[in-house]
Amino acid sequence: MGVLQVANYLIPFLVLPIISRILGASLFGSVSYAQNIITYLTLLINYGFEYSATRQISIAREDKTKTDAIFWSVIAAKGMLLILSFAILAVLPFCMERVACDPKLYIYTALANIGIVFFPTWYLQGVQQMDKMAWANFFTKLLGAVLVLSLVREASAYRLYPLLMSASSILIGIGAMIYVIRHFGISRPVLSRQTLREVMQAGAPIFLNNVFVALYTTANMTILGMYAADDVIGYFSGAQRLIQALNMVVVMPVSMAVFPEISRRFAQSKAQGVKFLKQVLLLAGAAAAAVSLITFLCAPLMIRIMYGAGFAPSIELLKWLSPIPFLVMIATLLTVQGLYGMGLQRWAPWVGVILAVCCVGLNLWLLPLIGVKGVCISWIAAELLECLLVSSILMTKGRKLCSI
C-alpha cells in the first residue's frame, strides 16, 4: 500500500525529464504557476471532506440510509464548490495579469477539479477500502502520463499538458464514482438540507486549517509569480519538485511505518512514547540529514539528469533547498507523531497560523530584496520555525503530561 502511494507521486514526477525538455524553462514555469494557482481552487473543493466525511462515513457505516445521504450530500457540496471555483476563476483575469495573458492554460488546468468532485476518496477511506482508492489514483496518474508522453511533442502544445492530465482525472473520477455506487449499492440521490448542512459544518474547521497550511506550503510560488519571470518560476519549480519528491520518498514511508508503533507506545505511557520518539528522531533525522547532504553535493548531477542543461540556474536553488528533507522529517515527527501522540493536537492550528503569517511575510519582504533565493530562505525558515514551536510545546505541555 505504501509503495503504491509513493508510486502515485513518482509517476508524474518521472514525466518531468521529458516534458521539461520539451517545454523549456519558460513554458514549464507558466504551467507550474497555473498548477499552483489552481491548487487553491482544489483546496476549496476538497474543503476538508477527505477527513470530515471520511469520519462521518466510518461512524455511520452500519447505517446505509445515513451513509447514502452523506455520500450525495458531499457530492452536492463539492459540485456547488466547483461552480464557485469556476466563478472565482472567471474573475481572476481581472485581478492577475498572468491569468489574463493565458486564460486557456488556467481553464484547462482547473478542469481537473471536475474529477476531484466525482472521485469519492473520502467514502473509500471511510469504509476502509484504501487499496481501491490507491489503485484508482495510480491509474489516474498512469493514464495522464501515457497521454502526455504520447501527445505532447513540441513546446507549442504546452496547454495540452494540463488538459490531458485533467482529462485523465475526470475519466477516472467518474469511473470511481460509478464503481462506488454499484459496488456499495448506493441509492438514488436524496438530498436533505440538514445532512448538507452537517457535512459542510463538519468540514469547515479542517478547511480553515488547510488554508493556513497552504499559505506556507503553496504561497511561496504564488508570491514569486508577482516578482519573477516565467523562466525563473520554471527554475524554482524544477528544484522544488525534486525536493518534494525526496520528501515523499524519505519522509512518508518513515511516518507511515512509525505511526502505529508510536501510537501504541504513547497509549501504554507518555514516558515510553517520548523515549521511542527520541530514538526515531535520532535515527530518522540522521538518515534525512544524509539525504540533504547528498542533495547538496549532487545538485548539478540531479538537475542535469532531470531537466537538462537548460535548467542550470536550478542547481543553485536546489542547493539552497537541500536542508528541507531534514527539516521536514524532524517537523513531521514532532508534529504528527509528537503532538498527536501526546494528545496536544489542539495546538496544531495555532502553529499553522503562525507559520502562515511568518512565511507570507518573509516572502513579501525578501523577494523584492534578493529575488528567488528569498523564497528558498522563507521555506527553510518556516520549517525551522515549525520544529522550534512544536519542540517548545512538547517540552512545556508534554512534561506536565508525563508527570501526571
Regions found by a protein language model. Name each.
Residues 1-50, 86, 145, 204-231, ...:
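Signature of the first transmembrane helix
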Residues 1-8, 34, 39, 46-93, ...:
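Membrane-water interface segments that mark the loop-to-transmembrane alpha-helix transition
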Residues 33, 103, 107-110, 134-182, ...:
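Hydrophobic alpha-helical transmembrane segments
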Residues 35-43, 213, 217, 236-260, ...:
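Transmembrane helix-bundle signature of multi-pass secondary active exporters and lipid flippases
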Residues 46-62, 239, 243-268, 335-341:
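Helix-loop junctions and terminal segments of transmembrane helices
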Residues 93-109, 297-327, 373:
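Interfacial segments at transmembrane-helix termini and the short loops linking adjacent helices
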Residues 103, 114-136, 325-351:
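Membrane-interface junctions at transmembrane-helix termini in multi-pass inner-membrane proteins
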Residues 131, 158-165, 174-217, 261-275, ...:
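Interhelical loop/hinge segments that connect adjacent transmembrane helices in multipass membrane
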